[in-house]
Each structure stands twice: as structure tokens, then as C-alpha cells.
Amino acid sequence: MKDQLLVPLRRRPWTCRKCLQRLQLLPQHQTRRSFETAASPFPRQLDSLPADYSRTKTVDDDTLRRVFDSQQFWREFSQQRSAQPKPTGLVQNQYLTSPDGFRTFANVSLQKCQAIVSKVLAASTLEEYRTMARDLDRLSDLLCRVIDLSDFIRVIHPDPQVQEAATQAYALMFEYMNVLNTTTGLNDQLKKAAANPEVTSQWSDEEKIVAQILIKDFSNSAIHMPPHERQRFVNLSNDISQLGSSFVNGAEPAKSHVSVATNNLRGLDPILVQQIKRWNRTAAVPTTGMIPRLALRSVHDENVRREVYLASRTSSKRQLHRLEELLLKRAELAKLSGYESFAHMTLSDKMAKSPEAVSNFLTALVDSNRKLVREELSQLQAMKGAPLQPWDHAYYVHQRVMQYSQARRSRELSAVPEFFSLGTVMQGLSRLFDRLYGVRLVPQEPAPGETWNPDVRRLDVVDESGRHIAVIYCDLFSRPNKHPNPAHFTLRCSREISTEEVAECASLDQSSHPNDGMATAVDPVTKTLRQLPTIALVCDFSEPGTNGGGRPSLLSEHSVRTLFHEMGHAVHSILGQTRLQSISGTRCATDFAELPSVLMEHFATAPSVLALYARHWRTDEPLSEGMIRSMERDRTAHGSIYGAVENEAQILMALVDQAYHSRPADGGRIDSTALYQQVSQQHSSLPEPADVTPPTSWQGFFGHLYGYGATYYSYIFDRAIANKLWVDVFGAGRQAVDRAAGERYKNEVLRWGGGRSGWECVAGALGSANESNADGRLVEGGDEAMREVGRWGLGRDGVSG
């Protein structure tokens, strides 16, 4: 629903390539800790005692490690509030103490929304127009409160009754949101307010930004069109949704398998050969799933690899038809909305601004990456002794990796996970945040009913003054039927709560709360009440041992980077605390949203950061300098074998995405295969074969064409920026724990959320003395700025094998 009005910048978790691959016992009866918080700004009996964060950092730090590494410790710690007589709702939401509470939550929120809509529609005085941006931001917040939380709970909660109740609450508010999308009076009133200098002169910068975001969202919802065109817009939007879902779920090859003589499968695991073997000494190699990937990597016969490669990259005609219909409908939608193409419509509010600028970035990136690609391919071609073909790449990469592993890879690397228990990694994240930003993670015993599973840990984020600033629910361990992909969810955005809201709440019901019972705090400067960001982190790590001395969950280097990536999103939500929720935290342009998370990956294995946390789970000895050097050599070696070609593959996918979505709306029928082949021939170092019939049509398997249409470049764009900031702000790791570097990054990037242009953030972090930003030329963005980021390149992005 990210493009729906009045929930202007709601972001689904980005499922990036990285994410898809990555104590001393406390007294048993300790008083609940207290922080400088206003759980209620008006007199009423609190459901729980206030907390106290006056204990030492050392105790909290030790507890943080143990709540994740010891199940016994966690059970004892988490049961300290089990005697609390009144259950707390899910994530402290006062309504969600039972499945029926979702209906109440949705209805109460709906009534508040309706009151705001009536107020906005009836506005006629200057004072009423001056509050309009804030009023509509609150309307957006009320919708998000229900939609975001219900959407998360219906996916994560194990109880079918709760899932169903959350789904119904989600549907109710989503339907109401669609009603608002057709309420032309809201658009008219907001435009009237935004056009009046006597109104806008009194607006803060945040109010002006939010007003423009909402006006853009109204426009994208066709509210300004005549009724018949608006209906056409709705019909097209529905068609696109249905086609997109069919395209994502309907990926299929033209052929289900390739028949191969079994004696030509030498190199493939014999157990797998037996699984696909048929009675007549042939085998049916499937064209989807793991087996074709393993065949391309290990089968010695080049002809077999060629057959498997071509078949596994050729989509069915039915799937290609779905894609081409989707592209046609999107082009028509853009034309109806007054745009040259779907890409022009989608990119108008992104950092890139236009498909031409994206093209500048991608072509510059191809150029900066080409030398590294040639180096990698020349090494593989030398192994083959003949021209390298697309179906050779995986095979010879595997051969090189095996050679490296046998000849050079240090045996001590197999012991690295022993130094990465989940508890020590969380401890390291807290210590890093404390060093860079002056905030840390403090375990908090959950109240009865607060979490959706007993394994969910609650962490409170506190600053150096002991002030509570955020809540994180960590659902990090695997369990049956849990989705395996790592993700960050914003369950409640940060926002300033007005005194009018507090008074309204008090007048309605003494038991009600202006933030539905969820975490709030008083801003020490403005003395206003704030709703605190509430975040959920979901991963799928193995559980620690159940007995007191059991083995903790040990993470691979890749899993550590994954956790740092997701915490990068979290710290953006934590520190990007704006006054208005529409631009808080991660609610920023799509092509800026991945920057904090990608940058965080660099910190995971920086030597000075490893020194903060990498300790053996049993002996507590630190990771040795020799092991750190071995890890670095391993990443560099693997990156030099395939890193640049992997980068090229991502660039090509982004180019294909742009080619499809930048076509003019009146361009007629789209031949997606011809365009795909054109991009491959023009930009790939190992282009698809031009002499096969039918030609390969891998685009039918590219599901992100629906979810990230015209914006697939965003991830590699943010990687290029992150690499630049890592080198120029954090000294390529030399200042990885330096407070001055952290404050600079926080003040120029993180604290703004979506309330500042991404270009201004990047330019501010680099400074005007930086050669890439000489005279502040990055501030305004534009085609040349995009080209400049492309010149920064991606390096090889070496990863552990």
C-alpha cells in the first residue's frame, strides 16, 4: 500500500540480495526499571510500574548478552513480571489483550479518523488551515497505527484467531483509506492551505514537506480527474495488482526438465543423480529449484551445462504474457496520470527524479565495474583454455573457490562462529551505538501478553541521560511456520503528540491513552509528549541450548552482516525522530531507504568493531588478530573470484527494469524478450547467446519487476553511497567507533528521517571540502550527481565463502 494516499511513505521491508542469502545472574525479584517517561500525561492508574535505568551500563551490557545466549537465564529474567495481575496488550497496545481487541482498536481509530476528516472538510479560518498539515499527518498516523501493526501481527502471530482478527482490522482500515482516496474535499482543502502564504509562512519545514507528500499522493490516486477517468484509474490499479500477483507467483520455465544421459552428469552429487534418474539410463534435470543451480556449478560436460542454462532461463509464453500485460497497464496508468512513462511517474519523488538520471548512474556504474569484471573473467577463461560462455561461469567460479579453499583458506575460519554468539553480537551492536551515537540497548522483561511468542526479547533504547527513546522487539529464533527472511518492521512511528490530543483523550475515557498504551516519553527540550518508535526485528537463527550451560546460537559471518543490516534500518527509525510521523525514520525516498542498512554491514567486520564484541562463547577470549586477518583475506579472495560479476548482474537487472518502465505510454506492444536481449548484448560481459531459438527470457523469473518497478536500481545506488561514506566519513573503518564520525553521520543523515532531501544528507555528510562534492554540487542532485555516484563504483563487495 506504499503508494496509497494518507499512508504516504509506508515501507515494506526491503528484501535485498544480502538479506535473502544472511553474564552475571541478576537478583530474581528486582524492581522494574524506570526511565524518564510519561506513560500517561494525565492522572490515571498505570498498568505497570515506571522503570529505572539508573543501574550501571555494565550490568545491562552483561544482561543483554545473556538474554540471547542462555534460555535458562531468559526464562528467569522474562518471568519477573509474571505476577502482574492485569495482562498487557500485544506490544503494550491497551486494546490487544484478546482477538476481539483488534476490532475495538480499529473502530476507535476509525472514529478518530472520521473526526479529523470532518474537521478538515469544514475548515474555513486561517487558524484551521494552519493546522491542516498536522491534522492530515495525524490522520495518516491513525491509519498506520492499525494497518502496520495488524499487517505484522497477522503474519507473525502463531494463533489463527489472532491472525484472523488482525486481518479483519487491517481490511477495515484499508477499505476506509480507499474511501479517503476518493474524498476530493481533502485534496481541495490541502491545496487551498498550501497555496496561501499566510498559512505556509506559519508552517514548519516538516509541515511543508508533509503537505507536498500528501498532495503528490492525492495526485497519484487520480483524485483530480473527472469521474470516468478516476474510475479508469481504479480499474487499471486493480488490474496491475492482480497481474503483478500472478506474475510473482506464476514464474515458470518453458520446459519443466532437460533429458540428459546419466553418464553425462559426472560431477553432480550421485545422490542427486539417483533422485532424477529414469529407467532408460537418462535423467530428467529439473529447470527450477536447487538441482539446476548445482548442475551448472558442478557438471563437467559443457553441453549439459549449456542445455540446463538455456532451459532454466527461458520462461513460458504464459508468464511472458503476464509481464507484458503488466507493463502495458502501467504505461497506460502513467499516461492517464499525465506522465511520459511509468518510470517518470514513479521516480518523480525519488532522489533520481527521472529515468534519464538512473540511466546516467547505471551506465557510469557499468564503466567503473568493467575492469574488475574483465580481471575475474580472464582468470576463469585461463582455467578453461577457451572462450568463456555464460553457462561456464558458475562452474569455473566453483572450481576456483574449491582451489582456494584447499590451498589457502585457513582452518581457523571454521571456528569463527564460536566467537559470534547471538548475545555477543547484540552486545556489540549496543556498544557500537553507544560509541557512535550515545544510545544503547537495554533488555526489558516483557509484561504478560506483551509479546506474540515467549522467545521474543524486548529491548529498550536509552540515551546517555537515561531517557527512553525507542522499543525493539527481537523475534530472532526459528520456529515452525515462521517466515525465514530477515526483516525490520516499524510497528509505530515516532511523532509529537499535541496537547489537544492529550486533552481529547482525557475527556473521552480515563482509561484511554494518547498512544494506545504504547511507549511515550516527554521531550526534555520542548516538554511535549512523544510517541516512541516501536520496531520489530525478525530473523531465523537457531535456538540456543535449553540447559543452563547450553551452546548459544552461533552465527556465521554472513548472518552477522545480515543482523547488522537489519539493525541499520532500526537505528534509522530510532534516531530519525521527527515531529510528524509521515517523514519519521525509514519513511524516506525508496532510493535512500537502504543507505543506513547497507552502511551498517561495513561495521560488522571492521577490526575496531570486532574488538567490541567478538569473543568466544565458552572461554570469553577475543577473536585474535590472526583470525581477523584470515577473515579479511577470505572476503577479499572470494570477492576477487566473483564479486564484480555479481555486481554486473545486479546492474543489468536494474537496466532491464528501466528499459521496461521507461517506454512511452503510446509505444505499443512491448516485446520484453527483445528488450532483455538488447540490454544483455549491450552491457553484459557474458551476454546471452544470440543464436538460440527461442531466445532466453530470464525476465519472466524477475519477480522484483512488480514490487520494485522502475526502482530496482535503489539497492546498488545506496551501496555506492554507503561505500563512499564508509571511506570518507568513517575512514574505511579507521574511525568506525569514533564519536565525531558517528555524530556527523547522525546529524547529517539519520536524524532527518525523510524530512530532508537525500542529496542534502549525502552532501552534508561528505562536506563541501570533499572532491566529489566540491562547492556543494551534490546538494541539488540531478543527472550529473547521479553520474558521479555511478563513478564511485561498488568495489568487489567481497563476502565470506
Curated annotation (Swiss-Prot):
It is found in: Mitochondrion matrix. Coiled coil: none annotated. Its cofactor is Zn(2+). It is an enzyme of class 3 (hydrolase). Belongs to the peptidase M3 family. InterPro entries: M3A_MIP (IPR033851), MetalloPept_cat_dom_sf (IPR024079), Neurolysin/TOP_dom2 (IPR024077), Pept_M3A_M3B (IPR045090), Pept_M3A_M3B_dom (IPR001567). Zn(2+) binds at H565, H569, H572. This is Mitochondrial intermediate peptidase. The active site is at E566. SUPFAM superfamilies: Metalloproteases ('zincins'), catalytic domain (SSF55486). It comes from the Eukaryota. It catalyses: Release of an N-terminal octapeptide as second stage of processing of some proteins imported into the mitochondrion. Residues 1-42 form a transit peptide. Cleaves proteins, imported into the mitochondrion, to their mature size. While most mitochondrial precursor proteins are processed to the mature form in one step by mitochondrial processing peptidase (MPP), the sequential cleavage by MIP of an octapeptide after initial processing by MPP is a required step for a subgroup of nuclear-encoded precursor proteins destined for the matrix or the inner membrane. GO terms for cellular component: mitochondrial matrix. GO terms for biological process: peptide metabolic process; protein processing involved in protein targeting to mitochondrion. Binds 1 zinc ion. Keywords: Hydrolase, Metal-binding, Metalloprotease, Mitochondrion, Protease, Transit peptide, Zinc. Its EC number is 3.4.24.59. CDD domains: M3A_MIP (cd06457). It comes from Neosartorya fischeri (strain ATCC 1020 / DSM 3700 / CBS 544.65 / FGSC A1164 / JCM 1740 / NRRL 181 / WB 181). One of its GO terms (molecular function) is metalloendopeptidase activity.
